[in-house]
Amino acid sequence: MAKADLDKDPFDVASMFDDVGKNYDLTNTVLSFGQDRVWRKRTRQRLDLKPGEKVLDLAAGTAVSTVELAKSGAFCVACDFSQGMLAAGKDRDVSKVVGDGMQLPFADNSFDAVTISYGLRNIHDFRAGLKEMARVTKPGGRLTVAEFSTPVIPVFGTVYKEYLMRLLPQAARAVSSNPEAYIYLADSIRAWPSQAELAREINQNGWSDCGWQNLTFGIVALHSAIKPEN
C-alpha cells in the first residue's frame, strides 16, 4: 500500500474494520504474540481509574479493552465508528455507542477520563480527535493513548520493521478475514510520529503535561495527559 493510501475516507476505514470484527481479538493475540493482553492491563493501570468514575473508551472495537478497564470499578463506555466491531463484542457487558472520534455524541465535560487504544492513527484528523476527546472530558480529567510507536533499541527496531514489512502481512493473510486491514496497520505504524512528537501534538491539542511510558521496547507507548482546569 502506498503511503498516500493512508489518507483513507473514514467510512472506508470503518468498513475495513467491520470486515475483521469476528476474528479481530484472536488475530491480534496471534500477531502480537500475546502481548495485547499485557498492553490492555498496563493501559488500565496507567489511567489509574477509581470506582464510580465515568470513562470513555474510544476506538473500543469489540470492547475487549473496555472490559479490562471496567475491572477498576469505573463506569466504562465503549465507543467506536465501526458498527461491525461493536456487534462482534455484543456479549461483553459494557455500554456501547457508535460514534465518530471527530464528532463524539457526548456533552461537554462528560467523563472523568478518556482513553483510545490503537485508534488515534485511524481518526481522519487525529489532532481534531484529540481536541474532541478534551471537549468531553472534565477539567482536570485524564487521557491515556495506547498506540504503536518507535522501538527504543536500534537493533530491535530493525527486526521490528522487518516484521511489519514482511512477516505481519503474511501472517495476516493466514489468520485474518481481511488481511488488507493489517497491511494498512503496518503502513500506518511506519508513518506514525515518534513518542516525543506525539507528546508535543497532545500538548498542543487540548491537553497538558503529557508524558509517556514505553512497553515492549517501545513497540507500544502509553501517552498520558491532563485536561487543564481553565
UniProtKB/Swiss-Prot annotation:
Classification via SUPFAM superfamilies: S-adenosyl-L-methionine-dependent methyltransferases
Known pathway: Quinol/quinone metabolism; menaquinone biosynthesis; menaquinol from 1,4-dihydroxy-2-naphthoate: step 2/2
Keyword Transferase: yes
A GO term for molecular function: demethylmenaquinone methyltransferase activity
Enzyme class: transferase
InterPro entries: SAM-dependent_MTases_sf, UbiE/COQ5_MeTrFase, UbiE/COQ5_MeTrFase_CS
EC number(s) stated in the UniProt entry for this protein: 2.1.1.163
Name of the protein described by the UniProt record: Demethylmenaquinone methyltransferase
Gene symbol of the encoding locus: menG
